[in-house]
Amino acid sequence: MKNSFSEYNPKSKDEIENLWKKAIFIFDSNILLNLYRYSEETSTQFIQIISELNNRVWLPFQVGLEFNRNRLTVISDQKKNYTVFEKKLNDLIEEVENKNRNPFFSKSLLEKLSIVKDEVKSEIEAKIKVYDDSITSDSILEKINLTFENKVGVNFSEEEIIKIHKDGEKRFKNRMPPGYCDSKKPENEKYGDLILWKQIIQKSKDSKVDVLFISDDRKEDWWLDHQGKTISPRPELIKEFRTETSKDIYFYKPFQFLEYSNEFLNSEIKEDIIEEVKSYKPDLFKNDNFIQLNLTLQGSIEDFNALFNEMKNTGYNILKESNSVNDFHYLNIFLPNIPDLERRLNSKYISKLSNYNLNLIDIKKS
């Protein structure tokens, strides 16, 4: 049975080792952009491993495009992180140094705090200068350009792009990965993941090679999740790749890439570096102002629309999508990050879906 459904089965140690010996390595744009988000030591180690892969690395045109489009924004965001932290620190120090109200602190403690404040401020200013300088003189960009010199794919023609967009419309309606999680993006952005996927497939077909794809994209249209835990790449993607290319592919998150590099490339990446990469969460997944609940429901379209219209009329900020093939429906609910609102939503609607003749298949919170 394993041969018939191999895309659902975990790879054996021999299969993994064979891929690491023969496959080419393809890195998503988020991997390259994360080099600006990691500490200097981690960033240096990461790009060093990529460079040592030499002719076994390849960059899809779509990855290069997204990296160059977003590089300056990421740099600015990192600078902003330091300026925001500096403001928070100054506000805290000002509160502590206030001698007219509780809490009251000793003079010696305040003197020590002042020294620490000056040291932290000095380091923050140094970090900000690094980001300011990197706008025009970027050592990370230089290393990336050197690593991928003559290893970048060509873009699809305009006709091919139009064809992919049309294919994407059909795939997204059926929630066929990858890319459907971006269906709400502007027209010129929402098919980016699908274009990337097609370029990866084309490279494998042209060069007749297996592929290891390293990505920090955490959306469900790339990864199979179960009860909040990532199990594997989406089986549909593995199957499609094998059908199209007669070759094999596997995905790794960045920390997994580092772990396996120690094992199969004889790298010597320290555990604290791997832990930093593993713990990193992109800013786009953090928003203190609202939460998003993604519900997968099953039932008739009429019952689903009745629920949707009632919630909409009640004032909920929601989006909907349906799959007529299997009667699956998808509800995206956006709530202000106020615990009582989530409790009331659960009490009034989610816990009583049976009253609407609907079954709750899955729920995700972000």
Regions flagged by a language model, labelled:
Residues 286-299:
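Short glycine-/aliphatic-rich beta-strand segments at the starts of folded cytosolic domains
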Residues 325-337:
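A generic structural motif
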